[in-house]
Amino acid sequence: MTFKKYLLLLLCLPCFVQAKNITISRLTCEMQEGMVVVESCPRLGWAMESPENGTRQTAYEIEIREAFTGRSVWNSGKVTSSQSQLVPTEGADICLNNPFNYSWRVRVWDETDTPSEWSQEAKFRLASDDLSSGKWIGAITRKDSHLPEGRKFHGGELKKPEVKAAWEAVDTLAKKSICLRRTFQTGETKGKNANRKSGKKIVEATAYVCGLGFYEFSLNGKKIGDSEFAPLWSDYDKSVYYNTYDVTEQLRHGENVVGILLGNGFYNVQGGRYRKLQISFGPPTLLFELVINYEDGTHETIRSDQEWKYDLSPITFNCIYGGEDYDARREQKGWNQVGFNDSHWRPVVVQEAPKGVLRPQMAPPVKIMERYDIQKVTKLNSEQVMAASKSTKRTVDPSAIVLDLSLIHI
């Protein structure tokens, strides 16, 4: 009997060794790595690696689980297929009916019908269908801003007296970058320091943000995400993108503060300097929703509404073509943190929603990939770069075209 056991072990050993040689990596959802928000059942992908030549996939199995409970909600079973990119999860829509974070993993079988080990887990999130209940907020409504409507404002059209007069009549508040803040109370964050009052613990907190034209989102003074131009621009009459963030670890027990820095972007092109066109879909506007799920199954939601306040930011001019002006004297230290006195800030107004359909941004963000230090500064010749006395103002307008690669002559 002992001999038979050893023989069986020796026969199985090659299969175990081969299975360990197969590695599953580069897990993607809709061709993207990392957290992705999807509107329906996702299409998943992976790469199979093996040191053995000729190794190929003959079947796969996908498992999807709730990220914060670990409960399995869908399993494909063993599917005979060599497909490993944009693999549909047919039938999962019956199980994926809540806007939760889901984790998934996959294993494959090779040409000898030997299974690999399960891959590491990756995550995706089902888009919320409740964002429409939030209000779009900002400093001024489109009606009060007197912003011209239409897409004809470019080239020679802008030189017409009636067009110039229309743009000059725009309320200056509609052109400004603003800071928005909202304080709220919550229970304890994931882990220790349980809320003595409610005893509830947070298992998941997700923020949905759409700030047009561009925004920067912070929670308790810390920037959330690594995007520099969020959301990605679009034809705002057709589609409007929002971003999703997992902020479970950033929430604190007790009081929290949401901060949003809002600018014009392509949504509200103002001109005034170099520009290719001048068009506005409305003044800067914000839609925000933070959903907090507790361990006991309850949840609470913080939305953009009249409870928010705003003030002008230190960015005194901003245009996607003409750059920005920054006045550091207007900085308000701690404006997006707990304890800041916002009594002088003004209440927001509810604005008209953009015409486009609200959709999750599924494309990768624009972000800083690498930073470079200054290596050397060289004066090209003996010319005087700028002649000016103290406190004299000189203005250099940015441009997309460099006409002189040496010095700027003023």
Q: Where are the regions a protein language model picked out?
A:
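Recognizes extended acidic, P/S/T-rich segments that occur
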Residues: 56-101, 111-117, 136-141
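Activation corresponds to long, low-complexity, non-globular regions
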Residues: 146-154, 300-401
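Sec-dependent N-terminal signal peptides
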Residues: 6-14
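Pro/Thr/Ser/Gly-rich low-complexity, intrinsically disordered linker/stalk tracts
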Residues: 20-52, 125-127
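Structural beta-strand segments of beta-rich domains
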Residues: 40-44, 203-205, 399-401
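Low-complexity, Pro/Ser/Thr- and charge-rich linker/hinge segments at domain boundaries
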Residues: 126-150, 280-291, 300-302, 368-372
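Conserved small/polar residues in nucleotide/adenosyl-binding loops
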Residues: 408-410
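Accessory beta-strand-rich segments of carbohydrate-active enzymes
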Residues: 46, 81, 85-88, 101-105, ...
